[in-house]
């Protein structure tokens, strides 16, 4: 078969992805990711390029969780050979955690390929992944929906006049990065000179616009989102979900006050291990009132829905000077390193095992593509949940 013949696959039908025939069990599940240390980096990229890529241990953990449910799991690198690997494997569904290989919408690359080839996949679609990566666009959508955000301005050239709506101190970061890339102690800006220097550095170093917003001095929280309106029909543990179809996770608070970058939860702070000095403090569940906890959860779900995110995400918020929470950003491909990534630690704090979390994401995705019927799961079973409240700090990394 010629190398370009993969373009001919699935030409026998013009039906949309949701009408793929239900596969015989077990499923062939391809875990698609960018492997840290093996994914090529741009020659002119920043020092923290590749920070979002996954380690071998994370990929193995996901594959093992899927295989434990009776399915066959395979790792496929998200590189230029992915189309041919998909042709050869012909998976029933893909578990996508790929960050992409550059560009303004790199996190949408793999979903776009899978949709072109009509292969089902987990989590958010092309558009939602593209929007979530572009923090400026995300904020514009949230603002249009009436959701609380900090005042902001995007700098494309660095010489634009500062908006009259913005007042020092300000906070600057790359508009299209994650994992705290481009964020350190110099991200907080107090003068016009600092603003020009920082914005110019971001544009030059990251080859993208700089997002400048009002600095939020209050507490920082991370909220996990899992589910959708009809999740209760497809989950083997319907009691996980509320009437709106979403599970309410414990709230995780990030305390960077004594971190390596005091008050700033940036890239360096996110790469530290438990044994390193300057590790931020993490409290899960956070010590918040029921009223505030409910508000944070409602905002997270609203932010998730506003950009069209699907099944799973992680939403970051910070309190302003008046003690009101404001949305910072959303991650539609949240880290899934067991015992380490925020979402995994949040889930574990209430008795949801790593295996359960991975299988919930898998089955939510499969049900969207009609790969299973409501309440027909064969051997799949969520472990019995025993929520527990953990008051001590838990050190994690995204």
What are these regions (language model features)?
Residues 24, 192-298, 324-326:
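Phosphate-binding site of ATP-dependent enzymes
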Residues 1-121, 126-127, 132-133, 156-162, ...:
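ATP-binding N-terminal substructure of ATP-dependent carboxylate-amine bond-forming enzymes
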Residues 29, 93-95, 222-227, 323-338:
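A short beta-strand motif that forms the metal-chelation/ATP-contact edge
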Residues 45-51, 184-189, 344-346:
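Short glycine-enriched, charge-decorated loop/helix-capping segments at active-site entrances
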Residues 38-42, 178-181, 274-276, 337-338:
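Short acidic/His/Gly/Ser-rich catalytic and metal-binding motifs that mark active-site loops
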Residues 2-33, 83, 87-90, 129-222, ...:
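Active-site nucleotide/adenylate-binding loops and adjacent lid/helix of ATP-dependent enzymes
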Residues 73, 120-121, 149, 170, ...:
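Hydrophobic beta-strand scaffold residues
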Residues 2-17, 141-143, 287-398:
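ATP-dependent carboxylate activation and anion-phosphoryl transfer catalytic cores
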């Amino acid at each position: 078969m010629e190398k370009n013949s993969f373009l001919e696959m699935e030409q026998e039908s013009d039906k949309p992805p949701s009408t793929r025939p239900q596969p015989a069990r077990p499923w062939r599940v391809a875990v698609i990711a960018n492997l840290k240390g093996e994914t090529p980096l741009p020659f002119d990229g920043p020092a923290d390029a590749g920070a979002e890529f996954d380690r071998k241990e994370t990929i193995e953990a996901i594959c093992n969780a899927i295989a434990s449910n009776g399915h066959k799991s395979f790792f496929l690198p998200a590189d230029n050979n992915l189309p041919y690997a998909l042709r050869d494997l012909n998976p029933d569904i893909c578990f996508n955690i790929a960050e992409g290989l550059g560009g303004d919408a790199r996190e949408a690359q793999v979903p776009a390929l899978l949709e072109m080839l009509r292969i089902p996949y987990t989590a958010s679609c092309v558009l939602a992944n593209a929007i979530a990566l572009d923090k400026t666009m995300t904020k514009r959508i949230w603002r249009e929906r009436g959701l609380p955000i900090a005042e902001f301005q995007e700098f494309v050239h660095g010489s634009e006049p500062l908006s009259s709506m913005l007042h020092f101190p300000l906070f600057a970061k790359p508009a299209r990065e994650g994992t705290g890339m481009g964020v350190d102690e110099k991200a907080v800006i107090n003068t016009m000179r600092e603003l020009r220097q920082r914005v110019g550095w971001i544009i030059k170093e990251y080859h993208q616009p700089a997002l400048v917003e009002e600095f939020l001095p209050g507490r920082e929280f991370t909220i996990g989102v899992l589910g959708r309106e009809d999740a209760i029909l497809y989950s083997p543990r319907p009691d996980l979900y509320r009437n709106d179809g979403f599970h309410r996770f414990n709230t995780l608070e990030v305390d960077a006050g004594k971190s390596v970058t005091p008050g700033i939860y940036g890239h360096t702070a996110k790469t530290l291990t438990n044994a390193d000095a300057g590790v931020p403090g993490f409290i899960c569940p956070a010590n918040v009132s029921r009223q505030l906890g409910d508000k944070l959860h409602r905002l997270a779900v609203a932010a998730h829905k506003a950009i069209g995110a699907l099944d799973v995400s992680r939403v970051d918020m910070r309190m302003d000077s008046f003690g009101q929470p404001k949305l910072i950003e959303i991650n539609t491909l949240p880290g899934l390193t067991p015992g380490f990534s925020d979402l995994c630690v949040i889930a574990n704090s209430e008795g949801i095992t790593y295996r359960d979390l991975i299988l919930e994401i898998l089955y939510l995705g499969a049900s969207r593509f009609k790969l299973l019927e409501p309440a027909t799961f064969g051997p799949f079973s969520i472990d019995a949940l025993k929520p527990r409240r953990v008051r001590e700090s838990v050190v994690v990394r995204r």
